[in-house]
Amino acid sequence: MQIKLKNIGIIKDSMISLDGLTVITGKNNSGKTTVGKVIYSLFDAVANIQRKARSDKCYYVERQLEDLDSILEFFRYFRILMREEENNIFANYPAIQWWLSGEYRRELSLETMEISVHKFIDELMELDTAFLANYMYSSKRYVRISKLGSSIDNLKDTLEEQKEKAISLLQKVIVDINKDPELIDYARESINQTLKVEFSNQIQPVKAPNCKSEIELSDTDTVYFHCGIENNNVINDGTPIFMSSPCKNVYFIDDPFILDDVGFRRFYRGSIAEGETFFNANRISSHNTKLKAILRSQKKLSVFEQNVLGDALKEMQRKIDTILPGTFEFSPEGNYYVQGETKLKISNLATGSKMFSIIKMLLNIGEINSTTMLILDEPEAHLHPMWQNAFAEIMVLLVKELNVNILLTTHSPNFMLALDAYMRKYHIAEKTNFYQTDSIENGFVQYTCVNDDMGKIYQDFLQYLSEVKMLRNSYIGEIEE
């Protein structure tokens, strides 16, 4: 498959192949990471999209039901009666009781919640507000009734008005959650918000904010994603921008220190921060937040899954175990790397070990397989050349043995050479592509494929090595004199 970027970040107009191992080299601040951010945003935005949509819709319904408190204001009186276990006048209205008791907050199924809302509407329509008014008025327990005057009719009219407003809101809720059955708008907005999070709201070139920007991911005759961008937002012209996704999950690894903050936490439904609403960008997680959540999940592969994945997975695990043989333990007492009888706090683990740790943990919980896109930004940064070689071999083997798609950036000549060497050793040249970022006019950059001219990459590295070598030699000469 190929991804085409036009006026995204500082990338002018480039196409990159993603058919196994894709390596991007170039100077600092040359847009190497841009394509990774885009690919992550596209794949993550639509991963498990049906489940995400149901979850969002459940959350939306829950918030609307909470808002009914301010509409059905006088129903607070009946909630008090229910708590005091007095005569429940809603005994024959189970859906109203479902709302009054707050039981809807424990509802996990969108289908069940929708059925309950329908029943709630029906019961409100049947509800005799005159009877309620008489009941409330005669009990003389509701202090605010006195403010309505002495007429029961005033109370009945108020209850009737509140009931009609509630019915109207609930009917709108039903319409809203049944809109967009193909999730065309949902996918567009999810992609839009994920791009905005990953690019900090600067998807388009800062120097040319009014230019036309495009993203397209395709493969031969299939277009997976195609979207235009204006004013740092995905254009909404009613056209679907997402057709299907070639990857089930995606991980973007650019910070080994996230292991220090993985933690052991319990999450409860309904714990989303106050003020968040349907399609709120605050509910779109950054790639690091998502990765931490996956790593702390501590799920394990079943025996069946291990058997299906077979020898290839075991070989990957053996390779990593030669570098990092221990296991990981996350608990309320702390997070540890455990090797034999020794327990080392993960925060004290060598930085280079943390990059291997992340890959090992993802493999162990079954999150790296043939449906995975793995994006790594300068993974060699904290690795000794010996471990750079080992890491490069593992990356190549993930592509060869598990058919993982990997996109990585580097500016290390040793790591680049290691990837080049292992790519040839394990015969995956046809699944490997090398790119270099080249500066063009007006501060823009383009990706250039250098598969047929690998010397260009090494020449770039060698230039700066030669410069400091000559500088060093000049001072050695001065010292000898």
Residue ranges of each PLM-predicted region?
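Switch/communication elements of ASCE P-loop NTPase nucleotide-binding domains
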Residues: M1-I49, N335-K469, I476-G477
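Phosphate-coordinating catalytic segments in nucleotide- and nucleic-acid-processing enzymes
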Residues: A45-T371, T448-E481
